[in-house]
Amino acid sequence: MTIRTRFAPSPTGLLHVGNARAALFNFLFARHHGGEFLLRIEDTDKERSTQKAVDVIFDGLAWMGIEADAEPVFQSARQDRHTEVALELLAKGQAYKCFCTPEELTAMREKAMAEKRPPRYDGTWRDRDPSEAPEGAPYVVRLKAPREGETVIKDLVQGEVRVANAEMDDLILLRSDGTPTYLHAVVCDDHDMEITHVMRGDDHLTNTFRQAMIYRAMGWDLPHFAHLPLIHGPDGAKLSKRHGAQSVVDFREEGYLPEALCNYLLRLGWGHGDAEVLSREEQIKLFDLDGVGRSPSRMDYVKLAHLNGIWMRQADDERLTNDVMERLQGREGVVTDDKTRARILAMMPGLKERAKTLVELADNAAFAGFTLPLTFTPKAEKLLGEDGRRVLEGVGKELAALKDFTPEAIDATLRSYAEKHEIKLGSVAQPLRAAMTGSTTSPGIDLTLSALGQDEVLARIAAVLASGSANA
């Protein structure tokens, strides 16, 4: 048997982190077992489904490196098949036409609530002859659900779960306008796509009992179900905007690498030893459902940022530089030309050691494209007082005399200057850093000066010396 999983989002908004994790788990499970991972867009809600949301799903999955093994299936294109199955159930006596009016259904609900019973359809038309209905009256098609016994699901994560059939009502398969309901369409699609394992959030668990009834009414084998615990905020409440990023788009814009997000989401609810950083190959090799817990997971943004920093330090410098240049586009006071790009690329080994997100990395690298005169932070301005400017004037002359403006030559020059004037190396490096960046942080000063280039370094020193004060 070929293992076949699917990710089936509704295109009604952004790709939420919970759905992204479900997609990742389905993808890894299929790859681990040498199976297939499929994508289905459940777009039957025409009022809420948009092409923009479809594109967001496709872009998000591609960014995460999650690739389907076949062209995506659009649920709306399969409506004829959904209708065909419902009519087959009708012909087999496993479904029936219900002619109840909206008013009758409302009265039914109100009566149940008044009697403190769950508001369920009471089966008024379950055994009645359709000929009793007024000619041309609208109807829905309902499943004739079993009323005795239990429906049992052997869930691969939650264990054995069961519900008394008496607690379930006869769910609608086709609405009065002939369109299929979500629960019915999903069963038809999963069966026809030969899905062997359905992995989704445990908020779908109650739906599974109803869907199992459709499978059994059609005489179809049920897939294996695995309902994954939800992701909560750090405080244990439902994840919301007040906690921070929620969607893949949010995390991407906030500067997280896809490798880091996938790595984090995998370990959020799945455990395997103490390994913190796992490559995609390792994820595929190790992932299986026996490591998935039942309890909700809590989003830890601090841990994610830490993990992102690890992945950034391992990332290719060209790739990081390209991302930084995109983020700096249009920023006031920053030139984003080839010269700036070359400077950032040269400094990237030092820049990426300090940053935990690409946003932070871009902020730290922006000085490479600053236009003169620079604006200085209060701490930087303090370093550029009388003593600092004296250092700049003196060391500037020695830097101007260098024929090879390499990190090694610069380091030797700064050390020699400090030794000659009997001051600490930091007393030389700190004013230089302030003059170059407008702040007090940068990669190593030798790497920073070399990357900026001799002409730019001397120009920035001159700009400080020419002003009455740093921010004049």
From Swiss-Prot:
The EC number(s) this enzyme carries: 6.1.1.17
The alphabetical list of record keywords is: Aminoacyl-tRNA synthetase, ATP-binding, Cytoplasm, Ligase, Nucleotide-binding, Protein biosynthesis
* Residue ranges, annotated region (Disordered): 112-133
Q: Could you tell me where the Basic and acidic residues compositional bias lies?
A: 112-131
Where in or outside the cell? Cytoplasm
Per the record, what are the reactions this protein catalyses?
tRNA(Glu) + L-glutamate + ATP = L-glutamyl-tRNA(Glu) + AMP + diphosphate
Instruction: List this protein's GO terms for biological process.
Output: glutamyl-tRNA aminoacylation
Where, by residue number, is the motif 'HIGH' region?
Answer: 9-19
User: Which GO CC terms are listed, alphabetically?
Assistant: cytosol
Task: Give the GO molecular function terms.
Answer: ATP binding; glutamate-tRNA ligase activity; tRNA binding; zinc ion binding
Locus of motif 'KMSKS' region? 238-242
Q: Which major enzyme category is it?
A: ligase
Mainly resides where? Answer: cytoplasm
**InterPro entries on file:** aa-tRNA-synth_I_cd-bd (IPR045462), aa-tRNA-synth_I_codon-bd_sub2 (IPR020751), aa-tRNA-synth_I_CS (IPR001412), aa_tRNA-synth_I_cd-bd_sf (IPR008925), Glu-tRNA-ligase_bac/mito (IPR004527), Glu/Gln-tRNA-synth (IPR000924), Glu/Gln-tRNA-synth_Ib_cat-dom (IPR020058), GluQ/Sye (IPR049940)
Residues annotated to bind ATP: K241
The family database entries (PROSITE patterns) matched by this protein are listed as: AA_TRNA_LIGASE_I
PANTHER family according to UniProt: GLUTAMATE--TRNA LIGASE (PTHR43311), GLUTAMATE--TRNA LIGASE, MITOCHONDRIAL-RELATED (PTHR43311:SF2)
Q: How does it assemble?
A: Monomer.
Protein role: Catalyzes the attachment of glutamate to tRNA(Glu) in a two-step reaction: glutamate is first activated by ATP to form Glu-AMP and then transferred to the acceptor end of tRNA(Glu).
**Family the UniProt entry places it in:** Belongs to the class-I aminoacyl-tRNA synthetase family. Glutamate--tRNA ligase type 1 subfamily.
> Per its record, how is this protein called by name?
Glutamate--tRNA ligase 1
Source organism of the structure: Gluconobacter oxydans (strain 621H) (Gluconobacter suboxydans)
